[in-house]
Amino acid sequence: MIIVHIADITMFYAPASGGVRTYLDAKHRRLGRQPGIRHSLLIPGAHFSERDGIYEVPAPALPFGKGYRFPLRLGPWRNILHGLQPDLIEVGDPYLTAWAALDARRQLDVPVIGFYHSDLPLLVSNRMGPWFTPNVEAYVRKLYGNFDRVLAPSQIMADKLIGLGVRNVHVQPLGVDLQTFHPSHRDPGLRTELGVAEDSRLLIFAGRGSKEKNLPVLLNCMQRLGKRYHLLLVGSAMPTAVPENVTVIDEFCPASQVARLMASADALVHAGDQETFGLVILEAMASGIPVVAVAAGAFQEIVTAEGGLLCAPNNPLAMAHAVQELFAQGCAERGQRARRHVERYYAWDTVVASLLEHYRAVLGTQQPMLAHG
């Protein structure tokens, strides 16, 4: 059988990691079912192993890194790529694995695609201040200028790369698992479980409690909304000092549990103003609930009238008004429209089909063709 072999390589893969792992897992499953396609995934691990096309490459664990590992040696990653001899490599982070892929390209003579999942200059600026921004921007320009094609999950991310001088940038949205996140997972007993009134208006936020999520805005918003509304915060590093109408599940929850909680809520709220895509927004809409998010980052692209409302960033009063307006317009009906919207545009099968078009373009073929093995 004629086979095209695609290899993904990234350090952004850990037990509790977010959008990148979700994307890679969904992609690996679907490419595995495609006739004529082989997919390999290279990720960090405690020791070398291989199972079902997923290769773990030894890398030290990051202290306090919540399962993340940081590769320090380029050689093992490059050597595995040499042994696999893929026809195309996709890079999922801007660190050592990216340079390993580019190094392997020199011997294999295959195209390498870079997927710009994380806004590195903004990330460094948030953590270390603006002094390093010019150097980080120069690094991003140099690294992503080496790829045969660059993918970005949203137009705002693509525009940032283009603004840095990176060429051949294409927007490639991510997707959502329409079976895992489904309205049928709604649990009528959740309000009783949480100890809130049956007629309460239940909001939810799911994700990491990092600075960029602007959780103080949500907490202030809940104080303004009052006891008729209740917010459930789900995820690691959540605040402990919260208003009475807020419940916290301060731990990483598997997708199945998050899906039950989402489908059982009335709406999702999100105050993060630096999102590169916003996968949790799609998960909420797939669960049949609308969203209230801030008009910033990629949310302006994925939150449409079908799925919810946008409000001014960093403004608890504006968010409270948007939540009230959402309920006044009817949450249930808008949640149904949100579900139909993601079914149409964000199913993983649709996303993978779009990815394959990018792969065909850089391989220079209309159909997958054998180049290595």
Language-model segments: which ranges?
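Short alpha-helical donor nucleotide-sugar binding micro-motif in glycosyltransferases
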Residues: Y144, R260-A265
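Nucleotide-activated donor-binding/catalytic signature segment of Leloir-type glycosyltransferases, i.e.
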Residues: G235-A259, A267
